[in-house]
């Protein structure tokens, strides 16, 4: 008991952050949204776990993404879900609405849990570097930012990549600080980097970025003797980090044990064949295109982040650059954050496949600059104390809550008030993922004799598992003798689709 009390005393701030992050994401977690890719990821999780437990390790090379981290999380979630189902309900049909939502909850819950674990460790580092007040502002900024909130509640890889990349750089920076070199934090950075690379190929940026990080940390005065010592430190520490990272990648992806060449070939195809060449359909500024161009991500930053984050992060970047030239004072972590944002956006802009969620890994770094600006501003007015910071954090939370509570749990519908919210944003770049399905399936299920209705929807539709009746694809209309009782169409595209099918 004494050990627990001491542990809580030492880490109570991190413990509170951990639970706030998780609890805020729990309401309707298994009932709100089946994201567009969720059925595919559920299938991939099944393939991965089946291959893993049958000893068919080559079969764990399921997709080019490669999504290995998500499939590990999903595999564990399925086991826990099955255990609880047996204890609470006995045998349950996972294709039934209740069975599906139960499993869906556990799959997403363990994603949220993983995010919270790595974010909490990162907050520990921030607290050691900048103090409690800075960390509190950062936590509130990031945790309740609508775009990050939305993607941290779905069965997908982007929030994982975001948190793991940021955590990896924080752990490595903290572990390599002069007088504080800690191999434990370097190894933890390697683990986070490996899990990020195993999630999505855009995480490969972590390799050159970590080298750059070490250069920023170790390079000091520019004389021959110190340069030689610094470069030795960089080479030794980078090789250590690099080898540990590759070891984690190898250990956590069984396909590499038995068919490394094919596995790496498939991974590379995901970069060159899909990411660079394939593109993705958009209605960008009212024009249909597969590549919205170089301005896509800067405009996405403006229309998808909250005004508070946009203004404060922009001011923070300006303040940082001003400080560098005016006072020759450089915060190395902020310098690295600026490098990351610039190189990541440059890398992603060079590919033809562009999506709003691909900007997600930059959010923690923008939040860092926003927090920096607020902390400097409060210091200037001599109000950098707990009551004032708590008040500012409360304002940020209240602002974000007011922006999203009307659309709960459809956080994906958030667009900045700079452009008039969703009504303005959808004409610039409409969200690629649907929302509002919960309201729709609740309405359909509430209709009289819902179980006997013949329902037609254009597939793929993502609320089918929650329906109490049988639904058909509209292409099957001519094949059924019974006429449809209800047709659910997504929009103008579906009317055009039906006209083509007569």
Segments (PLM) and residue ranges:
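Catalytic lumenal/periplasmic loop and adjoining terminal transmembrane helix
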Residues: 26-31, 254-257, 263-266, 270-271, ...
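Transmembrane-lumen/periplasm boundary regions of multi-pass, lipid-linked membrane glycan transferases
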Residues: 24, 46-47, 66-73, 207-334, ...
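Short hydrophobic alpha-helices at membrane interfaces in multi-pass membrane enzymes
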Residues: 136, 174-194, 231, 340-341
